Amino acid sequence: VTASARLRRAAALTAVAAATLVTLTACAFAPTGSDAGSAPATEGALQTVAAGKLTIATGEPAFSPWVENDDPASCQGFEAAVSCAVAEKLGFTKDDIVWVRSNFDSAIAPGPKDWDMNVQQFSITDQRKQAVDFSSPYYTTTQAIVTTGTSPAASATTVAELKNIPVGVMSATTSYQVAQDQLGTANLSVFNSNDDAVAALQSGQVDAIVVDLPTAFYLAGAVLDNGKVVGQLPDSSAGGDELAYVLPKGSALTTPVSDAVDALKADGTLDQLQQEWLGGTAAAPVLK
């Protein structure tokens, strides 16, 4: 073997060794699993209750205009439609969503949850933030008085006129807080659900109920005989109440869900869905 051949063989061995070292080094430092933190969030990367699925809770029952026909999986109704759009932004299809039901009070109580996010007109409050996380708001609403045309409340134009009238409201809600502040507690009846409050109005147990404005218009037009939206309560009409998704405290999904809501707001989807499902809810006088 000549000296030049020996040199060529040594150079080849050196090149192979260098290539092997580069390959091993690249493998050692390649991000895997949770180490690949700089990668964009995808369905597979999100931490959810059920792998590859997004579990969304809503009320039992869920009412229009928020959920049509108590069927959130249809993506019909404002909150159902927004939720399907949020899921899509997160990388989930409509079929990847698992819809479950939950009690309103338990959803905002401390402790573990068996869902990823919950949607049933939750207002953002500092007190609730101590127990759960909130996403960015997807809608801003006000609180309103709804009644029937034969009720003494139907002709009211001021808050003072309503203070001596039996009024119903659902417990542990922003509607209850506003009703308590504006109307006092002497004639305020508290119920476990809006369903119960509506039944009390229909039976004559109360003369009016307090609900958010879109729900008031829905009840007046589709549920109550000769229903009427008396007006908005003044304390809730300046700025309004921000509705958002509730997530378990410290959830890894809080930021991705907020980002999805923000993106839907920026691209006009939220406005479009609001017009489609809540478009007729603006014309109600503010009670003085």
Predicted feature residues:
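A ligand-binding cleft/hinge motif common to bilobed small-molecule-binding domains
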Residues: 106, 122-131, 180, 207-239
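Bilobed "Venus flytrap"/periplasmic-binding protein-like clamshell domains
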Residues: 56, 75-89, 122-123, 140-196, ...
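C-terminal motif of bacterial Sec signal peptides marking the signal peptidase cleavage site
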Residues: 22-26
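Extracytoplasmic small-molecule ligand-binding "clamshell" domains
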Residues: 36-118
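Bacterial lipoprotein signal-peptidase II cleavage site
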Residues: 27-38
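Periplasmic-binding protein-like
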Residues: 60, 140-147, 221-262, 281-288
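Extended ligand-binding regions for polar small-molecule ligands
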Residues: 28, 80, 85-89, 173, ...
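Acidic, polar ligand-binding/catalytic clefts
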Residues: 96-161
